[in-house]
Amino acid sequence: MVSSTTPSSGEYLLEMSGINKSFPGVKALDNVNLKVRPHSIHALMGENGAGKSTLLKCLFGIYQKDSGTILFQGKEIDFHSAKEALENGISMVHQELNLVLQRSVMDNMWLGRYPTKGMFVDQDKMYRETKAIFDELDIDIDPRARVGTLSVSQMQMIEIAKAFSYNAKIVIMDEPTSSLTEKEVNHLFTIIRKLKERGCGIVYISHKMEEIFQLCDEVTVLRDGQWIATEPLAGLTMDKIIAMMVGRSLNQRFPDKENKPGEVILEVRNLTSLRQPSIRDVSFDLHKGEILGIAGLVGAKRTDIVETLFGIREKSAGTITLHGKQINNHNANEAINHGFALVTEERRSTGIYAYLDIGFNSLISNIRNYKNKVGLLDNSRMKSDTQWVIDSMRVKTPGHRTQIGSLSGGNQQKVIIGRWLLTQPEILMLDEPTRGIDVGAKFEIYQLIAELAKKGKGIIIISSEMPELLGITDRILVMSNGLVSGIVDTKTTTQNEILRLASLHL
């Protein structure tokens, strides 16, 4: 095991030392350490399943550690709930935000601890105190606004301000930029740095390497439930962090391009969605064996393109031509029959049935084809096809009866891709296919996509990660405010050119 020399106790706000946690048959944490200084932003990194979530659940009292010590501001702590941790100065901003959408911003800020005047809530004081915190953190949100009317980034600002209102000394941020625009990310980073200036220790969890190097001071890496290293970011490279995370060197982030795009198989002309505001006059071709990326800022209507092609959204104008024959996909069933497949953006909410097994999740898009002559399901063929998904997609699982929700994000995504391949599509559309997936699993997803393109599938990929689009696609269609602002060759374009096109119609 690799380890690093760390300074002695007394320099830290939070010290988790020698933390062990076991579940039946599994050692989830094996002598894990996490030490966070004041005035610092500390990255906590590791592949999915490395132990990050379990470690933090031990901190917040959701799980009780088997052994080890946790010191906060020099005193040993043993919280039994997240509420107790929050009241004592340790807060977490979750990826899934925990706000009451129907209530006002200031209601959410002070929920359960309203300032009172006699028997009544002191609305004026609540407004003043909320506004004072927002001003200090440079947050421009009306405290009286209803939370449900705000953007995701504004909701995250409220969560951070709420932590600040508890005088939190440790703030843990879990994938905070996954749904934000570049401008919103920069604003979030400004607020995080303000917390750092005020003496907070920030624990920052993200799979986005560029963010880690842009923002963080130190990094702790976990692998397979073990502490691997704690080091200053200044002395590390991206490749070294990846090697610590996966236990081996990744010589390349993207597979070699071996696909050879052939004839045009899909022609889209002047496609316009019925629901407004949406896409307008979208035109492009997709070649056999081509990987076409779709880029754009949040709100550019990238997802609307694939949802309209797949029949989820109704088109008001334009044509879709497949192999020279004009088609209309009025719903998902028609799209599947025409050879389209769609891996949706929100894997957890629309891609998987988390509490059902891999077998069900592998077959659900094609279930009607498993009926035999008497109308019963052919269990033998279903089992065979599930095994094909597991083997061909290289899914790491004990077996096809395993609950899919227990798999890592990368393995869940492999099952979803395999499910759609069972429908034998010609056009495979993937919306944010590697969101929330660790760096090792990302490469495996890229390999699968490259192999499918090499076999002649036409592939459309939507991604918010520019290096991903530049690394795996042949061409990139750039969207801006529902319009196509350009189609560029990946070999000759630059990130700056794509960003320029993405801002063209704003």
Curated annotation (Swiss-Prot):
| Topology within the bilayer | Peripheral membrane protein
Kindly provide the name given to this protein in its UniProt entry: Galactose/methyl galactoside import ATP-binding protein MglA
What's its catalytic activity?
Answer: D-galactose(out) + ATP + H2O = D-galactose(in) + ADP + phosphate + H(+); methyl beta-D-galactoside(out) + ATP + H2O = methyl beta-D-galactoside(in) + ADP + phosphate + H(+)
Under which main EC class is this enzyme filed?
A: translocase
Annotated PANTHER family: CARBOHYDRATE TRANSPORT ATP-BINDING PROTEIN MG119-RELATED (PTHR43790), GALACTOSE_METHYL GALACTOSIDE IMPORT ATP-BINDING PROTEIN MGLA (PTHR43790:SF7)
Give me the residues that bind ATP, please: G46, E47, N48, G49, A50, G51, K52, S53
Chain's role: Part of the ABC transporter complex MglABC involved in galactose/methyl galactoside import. Responsible for energy coupling to the transport system.
Write the gene name.
mglA
GO cellular component terms listed in the entry, alphabetical order: ATP-binding cassette (ABC) transporter complex, substrate-binding subunit-containing; membrane; plasma membrane
Where in the cell does this protein reside?
Cell inner membrane
EC code(s) of this entry = 7.5.2.11
What would be an example GO MF term here?
methylgalactoside transmembrane transporter activity
What species is given as this protein's source?
Escherichia coli (strain K12)
Which domain of life, per UniProt? Bacteria
